């Protein structure tokens, strides 16, 4: 209870300082709107239909890109974690591609797919791929070798059976940590994917900023924060259910 009260107090102080800065003229309100300006801007966006349209588009990009990126990342991470030959084969490919930031792929996404939904999905998928890949690879590699030897002694000689019975359950906590990190990273990638003209929250933020409608920009920033909070809460619940055997 004490921690909750402190958290609420900290939030109230933050909001109060935020409101005071533009009201006292320390910063032009057109550059930094106070919290009191956000609800009217939100209601205006909802009434115009722009908010719902943007949220729907971004959720479509987010879910598709996240699914593609995490699916490939988990699959390849598990394979390279299980087999030394696969890790060796991909070692230099990983070293070359890993340092390239997701934003660097934007020009290629536009060239290959145009300013379109596939381009946004590609950028988001690239943005989360490496996080999940290394999480899965590291989690599989960290599995106790004694467990693998015991599995082989009990007849689990095929890679698929070892994966199903030993490796995946043991590596699940590490993989899920990577997936949770990817949830937040994907929202960052959504903005990068949409600021170049693809319909969604990022595009709407850029349109608003070009008109100095900073209150609208904040509306969409908070919308992303709220959506991430919902996804993260749902994922933590799912994670607890999947790992209930550890309790």
Enumerate the predicted regions with their spans.
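Periplasmic/extracellular loop-to-transmembrane helix junction in inner-membrane transport proteins
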Residues: 23-70, 207
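Cytoplasmic-entry segments and transmembrane alpha-helices of multi-pass inner-membrane transporters
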Residues: 75-111, 134-143, 149
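Glycine-rich helix-loop "coupling/hinge" segments at transmembrane-helix boundaries
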Residues: 110-112, 140, 188-224, 243, ...
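Hydrophobic alpha-helical transmembrane segments of multipass integral membrane proteins
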Residues: 5, 9, 13-17, 52, ...
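Transmembrane alpha-helical segments of polytopic membrane transport and secretion proteins
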Residues: 1-12, 233-247
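Short cytoplasmic-facing helical segments at TM-TM junctions of multi-pass membrane proteins
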Residues: 135, 139-175
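Loop-to-helix entry region at the N-terminal start of transmembrane alpha-helices
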Residues: 53-61, 111-131, 171, 176, ...
């Amino acid at each position: 209870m004490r921690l909750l009260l402190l958290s609420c107090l900290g939030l109230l102080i933050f909001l109060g300082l935020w409101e005071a800065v533009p009201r006292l003229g320390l910063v032009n309100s057109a550059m930094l709107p106070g919290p009191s300006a956000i609800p009217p801007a939100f209601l205006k966006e909802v009434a115009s239909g722009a908010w719902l349209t943007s949220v729907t588009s971004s959720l479509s990009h987010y879910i598709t890109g996240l699914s593609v990126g995490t699916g490939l990342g988990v699959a390849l991470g598990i394979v390279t974690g299980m087999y030394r030959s696969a890790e060796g084969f991909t070692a230099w490919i990983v070293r070359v591609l890993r340092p390239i930031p997701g934003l660097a792929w934007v020009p290629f996404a536009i060239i290959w797919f145009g300013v379109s939904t596939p381009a946004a999905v590609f950028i988001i998928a690239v943005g989360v791929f490496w996080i999940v890949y290394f999480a899965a690879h590291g989690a599989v590699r960290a599995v106790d070798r004694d467990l693998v030897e015991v599995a082989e002694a009990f007849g689990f000689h095929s890679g698929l059976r070892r994966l199903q019975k030993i490796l995946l359950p043991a590596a699940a906590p590490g993989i899920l940590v990577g997936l949770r990190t990817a949830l937040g990273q994907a929202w960052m990638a959504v903005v990068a994917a949409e600021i170049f003209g693809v319909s969604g929250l990022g595009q709407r933020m850029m349109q608003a900023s070009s008109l100095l409608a900073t209150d609208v920009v904040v509306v969409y920033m908070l919308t992303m924060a709220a959506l991430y909070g919902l996804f993260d809460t749902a994922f933590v619940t799912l994670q607890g259910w999947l790992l209930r055997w550890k309790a």
